[in-house]
Design a protein with these regions (language model features):
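Extracellular/periplasmic catalytic domains that process cell-envelope and extracellular macromolecules
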Residues: 26-30, 85-86, 111-113, 125-129, ...
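N-terminal, active-site-proximal structural segment of metallo-dependent hydrolase catalytic domains
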Residues: 2-110, 114, 120-130, 309-312, ...
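Metal-dependent phosphoester-hydrolase catalytic domains
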Residues: 5-26, 210-220, 228-341
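Active-site His/acidic residue clusters
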Residues: 50-53, 174, 179-193
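Extracytoplasmic/secreted cell-surface and envelope-processing proteins
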Residues: 101-104, 128-131, 187-190, 229-234, ...
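Active-site beta-strand/loop signature of hydrolases that rely on acidic residues for catalysis
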Residues: 34-39, 64, 69-72, 76-103, ...
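Second-shell loop/turn segments in exported
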Residues: 58-67, 88-94, 121-122, 153-154, ...
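Structured beta-strand-rich core segments of catalytic domains in phosphoester-bond hydrolases
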Residues: 39, 97-175, 179-183
Length: 341
């Protein structure tokens, strides 16, 4: 008797063949780690008469010596080395750096020097002498363009603050639009200081909108210490990135805020000041670089923390006023994982 092959068997064979072909030809997606870290006053020990760096000199009340500076570099490098699950991070945004040289010194440390980072930095007019910076793995990506976006306030023209750093990077054949932020502080209270952050949000959102107008699927990452929480007006009304349908931007750290987690501990309460905001083009991309709304983490290890005899632990900071504690930073870093073809 002649045996026949039934439709069910044929279907199974076809599915198996598709599985084999797909798994042979589909490229493995590479994990690209993006990190943001407020490094708490990374100053060198050299006097710069163009900025106010008097606190961070060897003869200052803080006694900021070369030995302490080198320890700070080593400590920060340890954090940035440990934060990535596999290799060193591919993109690192920093704030509270004095100048380009301190950033170059950081990436010249033994552990970070293993990767060929290139630094993007522009000197800002900030009255404290602190800037933002970006470093990227030059063997994986390249810079197409960058600019420092200046912030000014018509209602307070004397205030000078740090720029927003924008970089256009080519990564794995895909274009990433990256913004590094350190918005004006909450000094003087939330109500008094909020207008400056609302202005910063307006400037950032306008720039992002100009990119999305040219390319609706543009892949945008805005990271930084925004000095606002995910539910503050700058985020919900101007950036318009709170959870919700049909929004072009999404704050990936909103759920941390809702859960009472954070990157900065103020008087025993955690606040999610450091955040990642991404465009829907990055969230819903089938090709190139993509991410998910669960691909963000706060990096928090016991060795980075200060454990008081009473009260809750907080990030182990370098200084408290003039008192030297020798810690890493008063902020915790955050990490975003991209998946690139």
């Amino acid at each position: 008797m002649k045996k026949t092959v039934g439709p069910a068997v044929i279907l199974v064979i076809i599915l198996v063949m598709f599985y084999i072909v797909f798994n042979r030809t589909a490229p493995e997606r590479k994990a690209v780690e993006v990190v943001f870290y407020n490094v708490e006053n990374l100053f060198d020990t050299v006097e710069d008469t163009t900025v106010w760096d008097d606190e961070f000199l060897p003869d200052s009340a803080k006694d900021w010596t070369q030995e302490r500076y080198q320890k700070k570099l080593t400590d920060l490098a340890k954090v940035l080395t440990e934060i990535s699950e596999d290799d060193l991070p591919e993109i690192i945004g920093l704030c509270e750096v004095e100048n380009r040289q301190v950033v170059e010194d950081l990436f010249a440390t033994d552990s970070l020097g293993k990767k060929k980072y290139k630094v993007i930095h522009e000197q800002s007019p900030d009255f404290r002498g602190i800037d933002v910076a970006l470093a990227y793995d030059s063997e994986l990506m390249s810079e197409l363009y960058h600019e420092a976006i200046r912030l000014s306030f018509s209602f307070d023209p004397e205030t000078k603050t740090r720029d927003i750093l924008y970089a256009k990077l080519l990564s794995c054949g895909d274009t990433l639009h990256v913004f590094v932020n350190h918005w004006p502080s909450r000094r003087g209270g939330q109500e008094q200081s909020e207008p400056k952050r609302l202005k910063a949000a307006t400037v950032l959102r306008t720039k992002i909108d100009s990119i999305l107008l040219k390319d609706q699927k543009a892949k945008v990452i805005a990271m930084g210490d925004f000095n606002d929480y995910p539910n503050n007006r700058s985020m919900t009304e101007i950036m318009n990135c709170e959870p919700g349908a049909n929004q072009r931007l999404k704050n990936l750290t909103y759920d941390f805020h809702e859960a009472g987690l954070g990157t900065y501990n103020y008087r025993g309460e955690w606040g999610m000041l450091d955040q990642f905001i991404v465009s829907d083009g990055l969230l819903f991309s089938a090709a190139g670089c993509a991410t998910t709304d669960s691909s963000v983490a706060i990096f928090k290890e016991d060795w980075m923390m200060y454990f008081p005899e009473e009260g809750s632990p907080s990030p182990s900071k370098t200084y408290g006023g003039p008192n030297y504690y020798g810690g890493y930073s008063d902020h915790l870093p955050i990490r975003l994982t991209l998946y690139c073809d």
